[in-house]
Amino acid sequence: MQSLSHAVKTSLPNYLSSLPVPDSVGGWFKLSFKDWLALIPPTAVVVGIGYISYQALCPAAQRKSCSGRCNDNIRKHEAKVVDMIDIENIADKAAFCRCWKTKNWPYCDGSHGEHNKNTGDNVGPVVIKRN
């Protein structure tokens, strides 16, 4: 406990008072390279605390976080979505959805294109062809 007390009461104030913080706006332009390097650690701490606070308290940051769920709307009442398609019923080829965005489940309708554009993903359909 004594080391924490020493750090808070003595070391931290001494460190902060030794930082080369200028008194005027023009003083920032007169700082040397060594002075700028000395300002990096406290700046990184302040930016880190600000970022963590933003992530914890800002509703917009929390809204963007993903739940990890890939199926947002297809047959949600079922415990597991399974489709059996007889290969004999496929004409020459069929494209099946892998992104869960289609309105024509289980067939692909190209909905992944907008998803890929918005998220930078590269998902596409599974294409089955008959020989």
UniProtKB/Swiss-Prot annotation:
Residues 1-35 are lumenal. Its cofactor is [2Fe-2S] cluster. Binds 1 [2Fe-2S] cluster. SMART domains: ZnF_CDGSH. It is found in: Endoplasmic reticulum membrane. It comes from the Eukaryota. It is a single-pass membrane protein. GO terms for biological process: intracellular iron ion homeostasis; mitochondrial transport; regulation of autophagy. GO terms for molecular function: 2 iron, 2 sulfur cluster binding; metal ion binding. One of its GO terms (cellular component) is mitochondrial outer membrane. Keywords: 2Fe-2S, Endoplasmic reticulum, Iron, Iron-sulfur, Membrane, Metal-binding, Transmembrane, Transmembrane helix. InterPro entries: CISD1/2, FeS-contain_CDGSH-typ, FeS-contain_mitoNEET_N, MitoNEET_CISD. Its main location: endoplasmic reticulum. [2Fe-2S] cluster binds at residues 97, 99, 108, 112. The chain crosses the membrane at residues 36-58. Belongs to the CISD protein family. CISD2 subfamily. This is CDGSH iron-sulfur domain-containing protein 2 homolog.
